[in-house]
Amino acid sequence: FDCTDNVEWAGRQPQERLMEWYRRMDIVLMPSRSEGFGLTAIEAMANGCVVVASRTGGLPEVVQDGEVGLLHKVGSIDDMANKIISLIATPELLQKYSSEAIRYVRRYSFERYSQLFNDLYKRLITTKR
C-alpha cells in the first residue's frame, strides 16, 4: 500500500509542535489496540481534524461515530482503510465532520465547564433554604 506521496509519517512529536502538526492535517488516525481517555483525539478535533479511531477504550466516548469522526473495528486494516477512503472520496463529509468536531469539543472546553460551575455555585449561594 504505497501512500508516501500523500502521507507524512510524523512519529512522536514534542508537545510544543503538536498544534503545528494538527493544522497541517485533515485526518488523524488512531489505530490503537487499547486506549485510555483519548486526549489526542480531543486535541485533533479541537483543531478541525477528523479522527478515524479504533473502537476501544475511551475513544468511542470521545469520537462520536458518524457525527464528528469515524470508528473502525480494532485491528481491522480493511475497516480503517474503508473509513479513510470514504472521507477522501466525499470532501463535503470530511468538512462536515471537521466543523462538527470543533463544535463538539467546544461544548466540553475548560472555559465552558468553569462557567457552568461558577453559575451553579452562584445559584446555590443565592438560593434561600
Where are these regions (language model features)?
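Nucleotide-activated donor-binding/catalytic signature segment of Leloir-type glycosyltransferases, i.e.
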Residues: 1-13
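Short alpha-helical donor nucleotide-sugar binding micro-motif in glycosyltransferases
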Residues: 12-13, 20-25
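Aromatic "clamp/platform" in nucleotide-sugar-dependent glycosyltransferases that forms part
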Residues: 33
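Short glycine/serine-rich donor-binding loops of glycosyltransferases
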Residues: 38-41, 59
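Short hydrophobic beta-strand element within catalytic cores of glycosyltransferases
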Residues: 50-53
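Conserved acidic donor-binding segment of nucleotide-sugar-dependent glycosyltransferases
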Residues: 65-66, 70-77, 86-91
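A short, well-ordered alpha-helix in the C-terminal region of glycosyltransferases
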Residues: 79, 86, 93-107, 116-119
